[in-house]
Amino acid sequence: MSKMILVNLPARDLAASTAFYVALGGTVNPQFSGETSTSLMFTDAIGVMLLTHDHYREFTKRPIGDARRDSQAMFALTAVDRDAVDATLARAVVAGGRADPNPAQDLGFMYNRHI
């Protein structure tokens, strides 16, 4: 197996979380998915592993933060142009994300929005 990075995240609602990451461009990898987890690949080597809270707790004794209240991590996804950034954000909103909790930034060489 080639080297990969899988960012493990707790998911309160596995189906809704899976739909959200699919909307962002992830592809479900059935090899690493099941009733308590979903693996979504963004490239051949980079993915997100969503785990139900019960399954996530098998790996840590630390409390699971509330993703709606607490910052848990920040992820940056690249896109080919400004329109692709806006389209990705629109898909994420349809899948349950909240658009622009922070103002959009246009730095000339880079345009970003937040979900």
Report the location of each language-model feature.
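Short beta-strand-to-loop capping motifs
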Residues: 11, 77-80
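Short amphipathic alpha-helices within nucleic acid-binding modules
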Residues: 20, 83-89
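Short hydrophobic/aromatic beta-strand or adjacent loop that forms the aromatic wall/cage
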Residues: 35-37, 72, 110-112
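Residues at or immediately preceding the N-termini of alpha-helices
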Residues: 14, 82-83
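Core segments of cupin and vicinal oxygen chelate
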Residues: 8-57
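Short beta-strand/turn micro-motifs at beta-sheet edges
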Residues: 59-65
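Vicinal oxygen chelate
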Residues: 40, 48, 89-115
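Short amphipathic alpha-helical segments
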Residues: 3-7, 69-75
